[in-house]
Amino acid sequence: MEKARPLWANSLQFVFACISYAVGLGNVWRFPYLCQMYGGGSFLVPYIIMLIVEGMPLLYLELAVGQRMRQGSIGAWRTISPYLSGVGVASVVVSFFLSMYYNVINAWAFWYLFHSFQDPLPWSVCPLNGNHTGYDEECEKASSTQYFWYRKTLNISPSLQENGGVQWEPALCLLLAWLVVYLCILRGTESTGKVVYFTASLPYCVLIIYLIRGLTLHGATNGLMYMFTPKIEQLANPKAWINAATQIFFSLGLGFGSLIAFASYNEPSNNCQKHAIIVSLINSFTSIFASIVTFSIYGFKATFNYENCLKKVSLLLTNTFDLEDGFLTASNLEQVKGYLASAYPSKYSEMFPQIKNCSLESELDTAVQGTGLAFIVYTEAIKNMEVSQLWSVLYFFMLLMLGIGSMLGNTAAILTPLTDSKIISSHLPKEAISGLVCLVNCAIGMVFTMEAGNYWFDIFNDYAATLSLLLIVLVETIAVCYVYGLRRFESDLKAMTGRAVSWYWKVMWAGVSPLLIVSLFVFYLSDYILTGTLKYQAWDASQGQLVTKDYPAYALAVIGLLVASSTMCIPLAALGTFVQRRLKRGDADPVA
C-alpha cells in the first residue's frame, strides 16, 4: 500500500514556510541598494507594477502546480508531460548549486555573532602592527570594518588564482550552519513546520526593534529623506524597470522548485490563490520596511562620517593657519578653504592631499549591496552605536534567521524529488537522504572557506542561477498554458478549490508574464555579450581597497559549466524521453 503524502499541520504553517523561504537576505541587502541606485521612492513605481504583472501570477502558478500534482518539481513536470521532466531536474540542479554556497553566508553570520559578545567589538578598531609602533598598515589604508571582513574573516587572497588553504574557523562555522539546517529538516514537514514559525517571525521582531532605534539615531532623517525623495527621471530609465522585475522574480524564489515542493504538501482544497497574494505582498512589504530601517541606519553612518570629516579638516586648518577655535563650521568651511588657498597658496598646496572634501550627499550616494552592505556598512554603523554589542547580536541573529529560512526552502527543493522517488526512498529513510544531501553540500561548500573562497562565492552568486531560472520559469509557463492546456489547468484548479480562475490570471500566465521573462532573458544575455571579458573585484592589501581583474580561463569555463549544466537538462531530458519512446515503439513493432 502506497504511503500517504505528509501534509502541513495547517495552512498557516504553509504560509510561514513560504514567507520564511521567500523573505531572505535579498530583501535586506539588495532592495535598499536598488532604491538607492534608481531614484529612491520613484523605484517603488516599477517595483509594484512588476509585482502585479509578474510576481503574483508566477507565484500562484508554481503553488497551483505543486498543489495539483502533489509531487516535487521533477514528478510534477513529468506528470504534465514526460518530455518536461528536465524542467524539474534543472530546478534541482540550480537549488543544489545555491545550497552549496548560500549556507556560507550563515557561516559568516555565525562568525560575526560569536564575535559580537566581545567588548569592544573586534571590528571597531584597527589592530597594532607587529612591533606595536602603530596600527596595521592594511587596516589604516582601508577601515577597521573592511579589515575585519577581508583579513580576519575571509583572510582573502590577492586573486582567484591563489586559492590558499581552508580557513578552519569559517569551516567550523559552515559545519555548524549545516548541522542546524539538518536538524531543522530532519523530520520533513513535521520539523520544518515548527521551525518556520521562528525563522519567519523573529526577523520582523528584530527589524521593528532596529526601526525604533534607527529613527532615534542622529542623522537618520538624512537617510530617510534620501530614500523617499523621488527622482522622477529614473522612471524613464529602462534599467530601473529591468531591475525591478529581476528583484521581484528572484526575491520570491521562483524556478527553484521550493515553492512547488512546499505546495505539494497542501490539502488539495487549499486556497493557493489567496496564499500567493499574501506571500508576495508580505515579501514586498518586507523589502520596503527593511529599506526604511537600512536607510535610517545608513543616514546615521553617513552623517557620522560627514561630521567626522568636518572635524578632522577643521582641526587641520585651525592648527596649520592658527585660526580661532570654533571659527570653522560646516556652513563656512568651503568659503574659508577658498580664501586660504588664495591667500597662502604654497602652504595650502603642501597640505592639500590631507584636506578631504566633506560631503553628506557623496556619503549617501555611496551605493553598496550584498555582503558589503551586510558585513561592512552595517557593522560600520553598529560600532558607533551605544551598547553596540547588543545591536550586533540582534542584527546577526536576524541574518541567521533569514538565511536558515531560505536554506529550508532550498533543501526542500532537492529533498522532495528524492524522497518522492520510490527507488531512493525504498532503500534509504528520509533522515539518511537528508543527511547525505547536507553532508555533500557541506563538503563542497568548504571551497568557499578557502582564501580565494569569496571569489568563488561571487561566481556562484552571479552566474549559477540568473539565466537558468529565467529559462526554467519561461518553460514552466509555456508548459502549463500550451502543453498541459490553460483550460484544462483552469478546470483542475476549479475542481480542487471550488473557485473559478479569473481572466486576470489567465492573461498574465498566457501572455504578459512570459513576454516579461523573455525580455529579462534577452537583457541579461545581451548584457553578458556586450560586457566582453568578465571581470571580478579582488582585494589589494597594499592599497586597502578592491581592484578589478579579469577572470582566468578556467573560471570562465566554470561559469559556462554552471549555466549549461542546469539549462541543458531541459532539452537533454526531452531528447532522452523521445529516444526511449522510439526504442520502445521499435521493440513493439512485429518483425517483418
UniProtKB/Swiss-Prot annotation:
InterPro entries registered for this protein in UniProt: Na/ntran_symport (IPR000175), Neutral_aa_SLC6 (IPR002438), SNS_sf (IPR037272)
Tissue-level expression: Kidney and small intestine. Expressed in the S3 segment of the proximal tubule. Expressed in neurons.
Alphabetical GO biological process terms: amino acid import across plasma membrane; amino acid transport; amino-acid betaine transport; glycine import across plasma membrane; glycine transport; L-isoleucine import across plasma membrane; L-proline import across plasma membrane; proline import across plasma membrane
Signal peptide start-end: none
Enzymatic reactions: L-proline(out) + chloride(out) + 2 Na(+)(out) = L-proline(in) + chloride(in) + 2 Na(+)(in); L-pipecolate(out) + chloride(out) + 2 Na(+)(out) = L-pipecolate(in) + chloride(in) + 2 Na(+)(in); sarcosine(out) + chloride(out) + 2 Na(+)(out) = sarcosine(in) + chloride(in) + 2 Na(+)(in); N-methyl-L-proline(out) + chloride(out) + 2 Na(+)(out) = N-methyl-L-proline(in) + chloride(in) + 2 Na(+)(in)
Membrane-side (Extracellular) residue stretches: 27-42, 101-165, 216-241, 298-389, 453-465, 526-554
Residue stretches spanning the membrane: 6-26, 43-63, 80-100, 166-186, 195-215, 242-262, 277-297, 390-410, 432-452, 466-486, 505-525, 555-575
Similarity section: Belongs to the sodium:neurotransmitter symporter (SNF) (TC 2.A.22) family. SLC6A20 subfamily.
Protein name: Sodium- and chloride-dependent transporter XTRP3
